[in-house]
């Protein structure tokens, strides 16, 4: 489909930009360009990338690598499924965050092959990317992704009411209710999934409620 073709095209065309990884790309741009970059957002995104990947991507000698803290590297095709799935999501977020023009990205199931904590971190990375002029369309089945988005929405709402949410959730990760929408697809129909500014709880907790109810009956 169109989105997949664009994804393949971009990952192929942009590999050489990452010969020294995301940090190398940033340093090269700072030395060669007068463009004003969102350094705070990029620093926060880099931290989230490092925490999920546990290494840094580079494209060297015609191969994609994940460089480890001990000086060794793993070829991407030998990395974990989660690392393989997310490395180019992160690369594209980082690259487009550096660009001067607004970007609309479609990210399909960012939770694939990730532990719950990493799902939370990638949701926060998507929020950082979409904090300014950029837009992101996310498709997901993950209650952890949805739950994280709800926390980021709630933090923004509390901050607007005069409460100190910034000390818990950084402002660059907070999601504005006015700029956030959610929809639920079932039986070929699309329904709104936002209620009072938040993703509907039944979408997040429905499976857990059913599992817990079954456990209670067993006990």
List the model feature ranges, each with a label.
Residues 1-102, 125, 171-181, 186-219:
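Phosphate-coordinating catalytic segments in nucleotide- and nucleic-acid-processing enzymes
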Residues 104-106:
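Walker B motif beta-strand of ABC-family P-loop ATPases
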Residues 108-110:
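Walker B catalytic acidic pair
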Residues 119-131:
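Helical segment within the ABC ATPase nucleotide-binding domain
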Residues 134-144:
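Conserved H-loop
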Residues 147-159, 167-183:
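Conserved catalytic segment of ABC-fold P-loop ATPases
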